[in-house]
Amino acid sequence: MADAPDHSLNGRRHLEFTPIGYSRQNPLKRLSRSPIQTVAEDDNNGNGMSEEGPFKKQRRADLDDTIASHRMFNDSSQFDDTLPQLNGQSADNDNDNAHDSGKETDDVVKNLMGNLKENAPASNPLKEQQEQLHKLNTDNYNLRLKCNSLLKFLHNVTDQGELTKSLGLLDEIHEWKQKHYTLNQQYLELKAKLIQVEANAAENKQEPVTEVDHTACQRELSYVQNQLEKTTLQLNTYRDEVAHLEDKTIRIQEDQRAKEEQHQLEIQMLRSDVNNLNVSLVNKESELEEDRAKIQRLMNQLHEFDHKGSQSLLDLERQLEMKRDSISSLEKEVRALTHDRVHLETRIKDREIENAKIQSELERLRDNVKNNNSSNFEIGELKHAKASLDDKVRNLTEERHNLNQRISALRKECDEWKSKYQRNESLDSNHRKAFDSLRQELQTTKTQLEETRKTAQQLQTQVIENTTKNSERTSQRIKDKETQIQKLESELQFCKQQLKDGSRRLQAEEERCRETFESELQNLEMKNGFERTKLEREITLLKEERVALIETHDRELELWKSKCDALNKENDILVRQEIGDLDGVKRKLSQQLDKLQEKLTTAEGERGDLAEKLIKLQHSKDSYKDELKRVSSKLEYLSKEYLKSKQSAINDDEQKTKYNTMKQRLLVELKSLQDENLSLERKLLEQRGSSSRSQESSSRSSSTTQDRLDYYKLKYNNEVKHNNDLRIMNDYLNRVLRASSQHLKLDLLKLESEISQPAVPSSRTYKTVLDDDRYRPRFRSGLISPGHIPTFKAVALLVLACVRMKQTAVRCRWDEHRIRYLRNKMAIDDDRITW
């Protein structure tokens, strides 16, 4: 019988933990640590103690310390089906010093290894979901009932129900934050007062109390009075200078504005004249070119028809002379207009240079006016006058625009006449072509006649030569030739008749064209004269308007001058009022100086009182220091607790936002399900109607309906799963909110009780544990931390979770493929159907 292994404290260190369950001797002779080794063991080892007895288990440090310490999970959590159950017993506290404070922590149940059951039932959620999938193959009516019930449930559970408690807790947290802020401000004020008291005490100790001497104050008072008198004198002089400068600037501004407006009006008038002259110049040049073209055409016609009568030549020469006279007169007018334009352009340039100089002077004067900060009202009125003048200028520009429109209309009419003239020219050219063709035909007939005559002569000579040889043959030939000659003579007469008819027609066409050209020329001359008289009248009207505008401008200038004189008088009155106000200010200053002297006497009395108070404050300095220490310790504790409460409040806000977003998402999904349900019912009704109508497509419709049923069943099952998951998450978030709010309430009650208690006694037995070291991972040199050594059970659960996750992922992927396939198949079947 082998001896039992040594299970004492020192012997247990040489054993190694194995997943099978038995312990064997560690061959490395190295200290091995169990993941459930307690903190007390390390403390005992540090102190050199080796006590045997039952050891308490300690949980490993993990990421969920905060959740476990705040009791986030209760018995109804969503993880209770897959995690081992907890015993209802409370965990023992390892720290003995914490029991001396009078606050027990046994009511907080921690998720320790000792509280886990061995044979706790574990659920299989994937299997349950498969069973639910088989059970939930219901029709559309059940789906609608469930959707309506869920909607009613969600409408009943509002934020005004259970969430009002968490909102009240948030309000309490906000109040505690404000209290902490006020306490901190009071603490800082007390600290500043204490520093001031210490500084005043040190100064009073160093400097002995001396009698107050008022000679310096009296000197300062006299100096201030002298300075005040000097400044008032300077102010008066400056005001006189400013008034003088304002008068000067106003006069200069008025002169410059008058000059500027006059120059602008002159420039605008000159520009309008130049524009009109340019327009008339362009028109005259176009008319000149047209007249030249007409003269050229008439000259060509004269050269072509010089064989005609002398009367037409004389008429044409007269027309030519008239046109030359009109051209020479037009050229003279163009030269005069160009000379006027050059003169006007030079005048405009001079005016622009003068305007630039005036504008530079105006800008300089405006800068002076801005520096003086006066006469804004006059400037505004002048701006208003300038705006009115601008309106008048706009009206003139509109009139000019109307005149331009009239000129454009006249140009259009001229273009129409030109097009008509071109048409006549084209007709004339066609007639000429016809005449040329007739001439060519005549020439060809003449050449044929000459050839026939030549042949006749040759035949006569042959007849004379061959009279003796073959008289009969020659006589026959002579007859044939005579008949041919007769035919040719008849053709010649016909051609002559055609030539005469063509010449008559040509003469009539020439006379008609000449008459039309002469009438058009007369009309154009009449129109040009009418337009010239019209433009001269418009120019005279514009000149009269210019004279009227200049007269109105002079009247307005006189009005503005009268207004400026009135404003100067008002300015003098205001200056006198300001001088009176300055005298009143002097009196007030003297009264204030008297009051200051009285305050000085009272301040000396208060200084003596303050010296007495200072002596009293020195005595109470030690008591303030003690109180300050107590307040600082309390403030540090409160700041730590406030940081903790702030972090928990941030978590609560995040969870609340998650809850609201989840709720909205659920409502949206339910609405979409209802819409799908209605569309399903409509499709079912349509399918039933179509099945009664078309018996031939019964097999195809049955397959499509089966596909549709499979598709909507799969989709319905997926939505049910999704809704279940969302409901579980919603319940979990509600429980977390409830637990966190309860924990916050407890913490706040603790804080209130600790603040209401008197100062903490400075004893060794009392020890506040703000940061519990029990859950902190402990490391030893050369070893892995126990928090990183997983147990066999944890690894097995992790593997099982991974397998289940893989199975669910494969099933979800398969469902998605199936839904996609059915959707495509339904779409193809719908495309096949022909209504």
UniProtKB/Swiss-Prot annotation:
Cystines in this chain: none
Coiled coil listed as a keyword: yes
The entry's keywords: Coiled coil, Cytoplasm, Cytoskeleton, Nucleus
Record's compositionally biased regions (Polar residues): 74-91
Subcellular location(s) of the protein: Nucleus; Cytoplasm, Cytoskeleton, Microtubule organizing center, Spindle pole body
Residue ranges, annotated region (Disordered): 1-59, 73-105, 685-706
Secreted as UniProt keyword: no
GO CC terms: cytoplasm; nucleus; spindle pole body
Top-level taxonomy: Eukaryota, Fungi, Dikarya, Ascomycota, Saccharomycotina
UniProt family annotation: Belongs to the SPC110 family.
Domain of life according to the entry: Eukaryota
Coiled coil: 182-690
Low complexity bias (residue ranges): 687-703
Protein encoded by which gene: SPC110
Organism in which the protein naturally occurs: Zygosaccharomyces rouxii (strain ATCC 2623 / CBS 732 / NBRC 1130 / NCYC 568 / NRRL Y-229)
Protein name listed in UniProt: Spindle pole body component 110
Signal sequence segment: none
UniProt subunit comment: Homodimer.
Function text: Component of the spindle pole body (SPB) required for the proper execution of spindle pole body (SPB) duplication. Potential role in cross-linking filaments or anchoring other molecules. It is essential for growth.
Residue ranges with Basic and acidic residues bias: 96-105
Pfam (any one): Spc110_C
Main location: nucleus
